[in-house]
């Protein structure tokens, strides 16, 4: 949608100014690309990162990644805005800024509010802060409604690295919409045997039952009656409306285990 006149310049929450509605953009992150496509701006992409694989029909031109951007390629393409999920080096920022390219850094969320801010910032770049606010509220309310009807009770979440996600992580924030995380520490940690056994061990789908039961702390929980459920962990890494797939996976497995009993 075309932005109304008078909406620009837009000041983003981190102070970045967007002078006018961007016509050509580049993304250095699969998460940013998916979000921009969901908001309807994939047709403005002139370059993506070499890891971007969703949705279909992305430009074939690549410009590195957030960690290792191809600054020469970006200055040559000269998009209005470059989206990244992690801060670029000062020197890279300076080079792009000197070339008249604005860098918008989207932060990986840790809370539902952060998840909304992702949408707010991305939508605000194109349509102003009011539209950004509306996009943020819509994203959070849709995520909450996708969790309704799923009841986990108590859980812990096991990451692809076999660590447990603490209460200040995004995985915990999302799964806490339908249950209570018993791993109350900060960040991602190895669990000691002292953590109370949850009703469910929710695990990244790159793991197997054997990976979980082969871990001392988790095997104790399983013998105390914890059931193992698997969810698509990549959804937490690329937060978008496709997070609903996490709740769909839980719902299918929970209804399956209920009928199996």
Across the structure, where does each feature detected by a protein language model lie?
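Bacterial Sec-exported substrate-binding components of ABC uptake systems
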Residues: 1-33, 71, 125-156, 249-261
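Short helix-initiation/N-cap motifs at beta->coil->alpha
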Residues: 5-12, 61-72, 89, 186-192
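A short, structured surface patch at a secondary-structure boundary
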Residues: 23-87, 183, 215
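Short secondary-structure boundary segments
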Residues: 29, 86-87, 108, 160-161, ...
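Alpha-helical, coiled-coil/dimerization segments enriched in small aliphatic residues
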Residues: 50-54, 166-190
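Proline-aspartate-enriched helix->loop->beta-strand connector
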Residues: 66-87, 101, 190-207
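Structured C-terminal subdomain patch of bacterial secreted/periplasmic proteins
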Residues: 69, 110-126, 133, 204-261
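Extracytoplasmic ligand-binding site segments that recognize negatively charged/polar headgroups
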Residues: 91, 107-123, 154-173
